[in-house]
């Protein structure tokens, strides 16, 4: 399939546990569909058209609390689930580090800004930044609540994957 083929779709996935989400864009970057983790079965109807799925990588850090590690282990399961869905459908699944796609959209907080924020406050600000960017790019997307930040991330990750594919920066894509 050529990039200009209007049937090509791009899937972006934030494999978060409670706030995870996904987004599907067409070859022009227009919104096709999006949803929270619990609505993942809607993705199946598009699998034949999806060219590339871009999935946010999950990291477990040595300084994580037990609660954080448990949450991250569930995200790792979701990451593996999405890779299985994509692999089973013959869709190329490309991992992307959170800092990489967020840098592309100018959403990374600088270290000095992070230190000024209270613990937990940085997560809320990051979520609001993602929502604002996604709302600006796709005003018709249902992104009404802060808990929709995973959907916003999914859409932004899909756009990142679409742009990378367009620039031929994914090997073998």
Q: How should each PLM-predicted stretch be described?
A:
Residues 1-173:
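Phosphate- and other anionic-substrate recognition elements at nucleic-acid/protein interfaces
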């Amino acid at each position: 399939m050529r990039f200009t083929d209007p049937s090509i779709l791009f899937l972006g996935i934030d494999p978060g546990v409670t706030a995870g989400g996904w987004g599907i864009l067409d070859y022009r970057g227009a919104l096709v569909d999006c949803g929270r983790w619990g609505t993942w079965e809607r993705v199946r109807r598009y699998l034949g058209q999806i060219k590339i799925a871009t999935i946010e990588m999950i990291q477990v850090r040595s300084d994580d609390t037990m609660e954080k590690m448990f949450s991250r282990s569930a995200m790792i399961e979701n990451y593996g689930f999405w890779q299985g869905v994509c692999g089973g459908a013959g869709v190329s699944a490309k991992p992307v580090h959170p800092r990489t796609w967020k840098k592309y959209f100018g959403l990374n907080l600088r270290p000095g800004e992070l230190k000024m924020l209270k613990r937990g406050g940085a997560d809320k600000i990051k979520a609001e930044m993602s929502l604002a960017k996604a709302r600006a790019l796709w005003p018709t997307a249902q992104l009404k609540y802060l808990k929709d930040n995973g959907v916003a991330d999914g859409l932004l990750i899909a756009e990142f994957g679409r742009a990378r594919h367009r620039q031929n920066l994914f090997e073998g894509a």
